[in-house]
Regions:
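Acidic active-site catalytic centers that drive phospho-/nucleotidyl reactions
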Residues: 11, 111, 138
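Non-catalytic, surface-exposed connector residues within folded enzymatic/regulatory domains
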Residues: 26, 81-82, 136
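Conserved catalytic-core motifs of GNAT/GCN5-like acyltransferases
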Residues: 106, 119, 124-141
Length: 150
């Protein structure tokens, strides 16, 4: 079991390192501060027993009843150990408690592991996004209710 907590100002360097090891695309580390201004409670960090961040999820509010996962990363050595599921469940619980009913995200079509993870966790693929990424890669939009039993 991993500790899930809110993002803290001092987390930026660790989360940026996780992002560099998780994503194919470069982005500016200031995005963490930006997302925090968009929806403070939608920024969660998973820590190991020593308190070191090993994963994170960053979301924003996009409509009156919908939230969007913008970034979701877990260190490679911590994947398939339940970190991602704990983060996603905590994110959905936060969204539900604030009255949101659905969550969306985008993922590369080539990222089959992530797509399987989301499908196992109640998401469905809703759109193919041709040339969605800067390098021309295609994406898939996925959506799910915030409550797992819906």
């Amino acid at each position: 079991m991993f500790q899930i907590r809110d993002f803290r100002e001092g987390d930026t360097d660790a989360l940026y390192d996780i992002a560099l090891r998780s994503f194919d695309e470069y982005f500016d580390p200031s995005v963490f501060a930006y997302f925090r201004t968009q929806w403070r409670t939608g920024q969660l960090v998973a820590c190991d027993v020593t308190g070191r961040p090993v994963g994170f999820i960053a979301g924003t509010r996009i409509e009156s009843r919908k939230v969007r996962i913008m970034l979701f990363g877990v260190l490679p050595e911590y994947r398939n150990k339940g970190v991602g599921k704990q983060l996603l469940d905590a994110f959905r619980m936060r969204a539900m408690m604030e009255g949101y009913i659905s969550v969306i995200l985008e993922v590369r079509t080539s990222n089959t592991d992530a797509r399987r993870f989301y499908l196992r966790n109640g998401f469905r693929e809703t759109d193919i996004l041709m040339h969605y990424y800067r390098d021309g890669g295609d994406g898939v939009r996925m959506a799910a209710p915030v409550q797992m039993n819906q």
